[in-house]
């Protein structure tokens, strides 16, 4: 994750993949295997609450200070900032749950840390069915944060916390609410 730092990098990866059909190309989107995400996917696949209306996701890191001088703070090595580090997992889950998005409106900022990578990203996405998704990926959250809300025609899911080695994102939870 991600498949490359630039479009040219990604094209090279695709070329190699085509030349080597005997190999499997995989990316590190490990969030798909967390218990709350697997249960949410099951609810969606079983159509328990009808169509998805929208998503709202926040994925933030508490500080980037340890990254001063680190490769993650340098675009030439990292390809980008907080979106490619953490936010890409949220985008993957949006797509894992409802497919590709066709429209994107976004803003990026490096207002606080002033690195050559972004420290905050806000984006709104829409797919061909009109499902919308909103993401805020932040390196100025001041506390690790993970929250994904999914609103359906007949219910609501909230995934919060994320099992990690540091346990800094809190206890992983899935709240399931049926429309009253």
Predicted regions and their residues:
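Beta-strand-loop-alpha-helix segment that lines the small-molecule cofactor/substrate pocket
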Residues: 1-32, 47
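A cross-family signal for key residues in well-ordered alpha-helices
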Residues: 7, 14, 41, 92-95, ...
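Short, hinge-like loop/turn segments at secondary-structure boundaries
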Residues: 15-19, 42-46, 71-74, 121-123, ...
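Predominantly a Rossmann-like dinucleotide-binding segment in NAD(P)-dependent oxidoreductases
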Residues: 23, 31-114
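Well-ordered beta-strand positions enriched in small/hydrophobic/aromatic, beta-favoring residues
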Residues: 55, 71, 104, 123, ...
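Contiguous beta-strand/loop segments that form the cofactor/metal-binding neighborhood of enzyme cores
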Residues: 85, 92-166
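C-terminal active-site/capping subdomain that shapes the small-molecule cofactor and substrate pocket
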Residues: 160-180
